[in-house]
Amino acid sequence: MTAPSQVLKIHRPDDWHVHLRDGDMLKTVVPYTSEIYGRAIVMPNLASPITTVDAAIAYRQRILDAVPAGHDFTPLMTCYLTDSLDADELERGFHEGVFTAAKLYPANATTNSSHGVTSIDAIMPVLERMEKLGMPLLVHGEVTHADVDIFDREARFIDTVMEPLRQRLTALKVVFEHITTKDAAQYVRDGNDYLAATITPQHLMFNRNHMLVGGIRPHLYCLPILKRNIHQQALRELVASGFTRAFLGTDSAPHSRHRKETSCGCAGCFNAPSALGSYAVVFEEMNALAHFEAFCSLNGPQFYGLPVNKGWVELVRDEQQIPENIALADDSLVPFLAGETVRWSVKK
């Protein structure tokens, strides 16, 4: 019997979906991402969404100002799609290397999405332009109709929005972000080379029982919400299969403790401190460590048409203790897996 590996050496990974926020929160959370990842797709859903080239340039600079000396990190900026967005502004940002992709939030689907898109028809000229440019569309894949159960929002989105959109724009590159269901896993698996998906550590590690049985755990509450264990298992099987159009996207989404532990708490898991080790745990549990590097470091660049990072990261079989909380200026952050240990840690 072969002894389990003690070291995992992979090309420096990228995070293809992260929320870095702004202000003091940004200064606190950026180093957890920039220390490990070479690049990150930065979500544009600030309180004032990133809808112009100038706003993206300014936000990118605030991020870079928060990167500690010695970290080699490039934020990849995204444009927040709205019903009134100017396609020329989007194209300018893409050609100038400011916008890497554009983000579709259905209106009111998640944090700071009230400015989001009300219908695909409203932004069809913009999407047609993106198809011509080869610019990826990043999709929060949930419908938000009041009559649709929250656990069914993703599956309904596939039937009513995603598939009609991809039928109309057959060469549009689409990332189905943070997929959570067996429906989405199968849909992406059956798709063509223009369709990919990101998957978070929490949706691979947990299901809704973990969040709701024996007491409600607000720090596992995120959107899309954790689903049944059959959906969790489908996601685990997808990544364990070595499927090349699924890649790392943490959806790390920090909120202060008082905004999570309250009568109406915010959605989001701040998983940046533990995400890479958490993914390694899942791949090891699935006997799929052979596919770990591709998921973290190779599949994303291949889909985006970007080079693989030149540097390397080593994970060691050395238990990492996740802190109970992380200080903020006037509050604290409770990270994903707070107080627990993860058996793979990034070698410093």
From Swiss-Prot:
Zn(2+) 1 binds at residues 17, 19, 103, 251. One of its GO terms (cellular component) is cytosol. Substrate binds at residues 19-21, 45, 140, 223, 255, 267. GO terms for biological process: 'de novo' pyrimidine nucleobase biosynthetic process; 'de novo' UMP biosynthetic process. Its cofactor is Zn(2+). Zn(2+) 2 binds at residues 103, 140, 178. Pathway: Pyrimidine metabolism; UMP biosynthesis via de novo pathway; (S)-dihydroorotate from bicarbonate: step 3/3. It catalyses: (S)-dihydroorotate + H2O = N-carbamoyl-L-aspartate + H(+). The modification N6-carboxylysine is found at residue 103. Gene3D superfamilies: Metal-dependent hydrolases. One of its GO terms (molecular function) is zinc ion binding. The active site is at 251. Keywords: Hydrolase, Metal-binding, Pyrimidine biosynthesis, Zinc. It comes from the Bacteria. Homodimer. PANTHER family: DIHYDROOROTASE. Catalyzes the reversible cyclization of carbamoyl aspartate to dihydroorotate. NCBIfam families: pyrC_dimer. This is Dihydroorotase. It comes from Salmonella arizonae (strain ATCC BAA-731 / CDC346-86 / RSK2980). The lineage of its organism: Bacteria, Pseudomonadati, Pseudomonadota, Gammaproteobacteria, Enterobacterales.
